[in-house]
Amino acid sequence: MLSSTATTMLRAGVSRSSGALQPMLLRSAACPCSPFSMNTKLSQPTSVRPLSTSPSALVLRFRAQQQAQLAQQQLRRASSSSSSSSSSTRPRSDAELDANAAEAAAAAQSAAHAGEPVLDWNTFFKLRKTRRRVQLAFSVIMTLITSGAGGAVLSTGVADAMVAQVPLEPMFAVGLMTASFGALGWLMGPAMGGMVFNALKSKYRGQMEIKEGQFFARIKKHRVDPSASSMGNPVPDFYGEKISSVAGYRQWLKDQRAFNKKRTTFV
């Protein structure tokens, strides 16, 4: 009996001691300060990788694009400001440059020839009409002279070899040659008439040149754009050849404004 009881007690003590040892081992494994330390992965301190603070390649590319866009905007603003300042300081077109140059030339010519009679616009248009008539008369006269002289020369048979080479009837060939002589005389007429007119009106020659420069500068400045013309809206006297008075010039300006109004409003 004693032996069985002692055996039972020993077994109970061993089991009790083994049951108490198991949680102690667990506590030592969980706690690194325990004397029963175990080299496990949980007990070893894990190394924490520091977060990288440098930007990625995508962020750098986006920043570079933003900087390039800002630089382009600054360049555009600078160019627009410089162009606006330069446009405010210089004339807007070549027509204005021509008008300013013509006015400066007129002032210099009038100062250089102070003793000459002053030529107003009405007198200028009258002299211009007279010169045109003289040139037209000389064109007719030179046409008659050259055509008659050419016909007389051709009738002598000087150009028979040339007439034979033309694949037409001899009468038609001679007629064409005579007409060509007449056309040459028509082209020579304005030059001859201008020379005669300048000789007769020599005191107005310098003033007329100045007035012509001013007149054509005004025509170039105020005339319309011919590219916008059409069959229903033709260009009204593009070169100002029909202007023969101050009233005619004012009517020409009204025609230019009417053309622009019709072009913009499609009336």
Curated annotation (Swiss-Prot):
Cellular compartments per GO CC: PAM complex, Tim23 associated import motor
Membrane topology: Multi-pass membrane protein
TM regions (residue ranges): 134-154, 171-191
InterPro entries: Pam17
Subcellular location: Mitochondrion inner membrane
Protein keywords: Membrane, Mitochondrion, Mitochondrion inner membrane, Protein transport, Transit peptide, Translocation, Transmembrane, Transmembrane helix, Transport
Pfam families in UniProt: Pam17
Transit peptide extent on chain: 1-86
Composition bias, Low complexity: 71-88
GO biological process entries: protein import into mitochondrial matrix
Keyword Protein transport: yes
Principal subcellular localization: mitochondrion
Region (Disordered): 71-101
Task performed by this protein: Component of the PAM complex, a complex required for the translocation of transit peptide-containing proteins from the inner membrane into the mitochondrial matrix in an ATP-dependent manner.
Stated family: Belongs to the PAM17 family.
Quaternary structure and partners: Component of the PAM complex, at least composed of hsp70-5/ssc1, grpe/mge1, tim44, un-4/pam16, pam17 and tim14/pam18.
Protein's UniProt name: Presequence translocated-associated motor subunit pam17, mitochondrial
Organism encoding this protein: Neurospora crassa (strain ATCC 24698 / 74-OR23-1A / CBS 708.71 / DSM 1257 / FGSC 987)
Record lineage: Eukaryota, Fungi, Dikarya, Ascomycota, Pezizomycotina
